[in-house]
Amino acid sequence: MKHAVVIGSGPNGLAAAVKLAREGVHVTVHEARDTIGGGCRTAELTLPGFRHDICAAVLPLARRSPAFRGLDIAWIDPPIPAAHALDGDAVTLERGLQETADGLGADAQTYRALVEPFVRAWPKRWSRWDLLRLRPSLVRGLLSARAIARLFETERAGALFAGNAAHSVLPLERAASAGFGLTLCAAAHVDGWAFPRGGSQALVDALAARLVELGGEIVTSSRVDELPRADAVLCDVAPSEFARLARLPRYALGFRHGPAAFKLDWALDAPIPWRSEVLRRTATVHLGGTFAEIAASERAPWEGRGPGARPFVLVVQQSLFDDSRAPAGKHTAWAYCHVPNRWDGDATDAIEGQVERFAPGFRELVLARNVMRPRDFEEYNANDVGGDIVGGANTLWQLAARPRLRPLPWRTPLPNVYLCSASTPPGGGVHGLCGLAAARVALRDLR
């Protein structure tokens, strides 16, 4: 029997391990920390009984991913996938494409024309090479978010799109930022923005259980300092860490990490008191106001500036729909903004000020908070280099050359050694596809 070693137990590493085990390979996973999960861990970060997702929280790309097919996970679907707060109003990303379009007034037809091709093509959009075969309507994803926003007449449509495009962690004037916005809008219409009951940890726990069922093993508190001997070695690590393990100092030269996250978790005495009632019907709320406000916020970390008074903030409030997250009558919330890589400032007031802007009285409900700065993210997960939680800057070049421009970028210069982290295609997000792709290449080479 062939033997494979996987370094790292995040969703990509475990997805790779499960694929290999299904094909009859004996797999050992090594995890440096004492718990598995990578970017999908859940813990009591504030007060006893309040369970918070340490990194990933809502997983719009996970449920239909072939990497997670057949797992026993209880998914929760809020009535509205996501919403965007405006001063005195809000705009919603509904489950239905037409429902969303209907809320955009004069931009209904434009929104539908932009997003519907992505909805129709969704099952085919798991390979980075699909862009070579896409219809012109889908190639719009290579444009900047600003270019797409110019097609809208209303502030509501521009703001809704900006909030989704900001997940790219790119300036909204940069090429390919539109693709992230269009993809996430389409995800809402294809399958909602769901999350696992109990926390994102449930996803990796299900992957781990499947691996053990298939005869694999997981060793925690097992830091790897040199590449082990095996028929195949798959590394769910950052390119710089792979360069260290492989003793290839030039391997990661030129690979760039993007801005970092600054995150707060709150234990709350009551739900967030949103001024707009519709924001209480979703788990995901984008705070940032207009397109212009969000564009300015997302430009700042690329220019080395910390957040201003009104940063773009992503808020997740799972306890409205998942009573396992907090004691009876209490609630949790999770929020982050983008800051420069390795930034050592404090964005607490800026983030809480944005929440207060749209939910007056919020601060009075905070029982306890947990703060995660860029250095905390990297300490928690070595793949989050400098606090970058998406595996590397999502520039147009690095979407193609991730981490290097090669026909099969999961292969490394070493035989039978592969990279399977979010620093390989198709990139960041909880979908397991980086690991699945690397495992498929490894299986081909093992035959």
Model regions and ranges:
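Extreme N-terminal leader/targeting segments of oxidoreductases
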Residues: 1-5, 22-23, 398-411, 447
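Mid-domain catalytic core of redox enzymes
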Residues: 216, 220-326
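Rossmann-like flavin
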Residues: 86-175
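N-terminal glycine-rich phosphate/pyrophosphate-binding loop and immediately adjacent elements
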Residues: 2-124
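Helical element adjacent to the flavin cofactor pocket in flavoenzyme catalytic cores
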Residues: 183-224
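A conserved FAD-binding loop/helix module that cradles the flavin
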Residues: 56, 420-443
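A glycine-rich dinucleotide-binding beta-alpha-beta segment and adjacent secondary-structure elements
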Residues: 158-171, 310-314, 361-425
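Flavin-binding catalytic cores
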Residues: 110, 271-272, 301, 305-309, ...
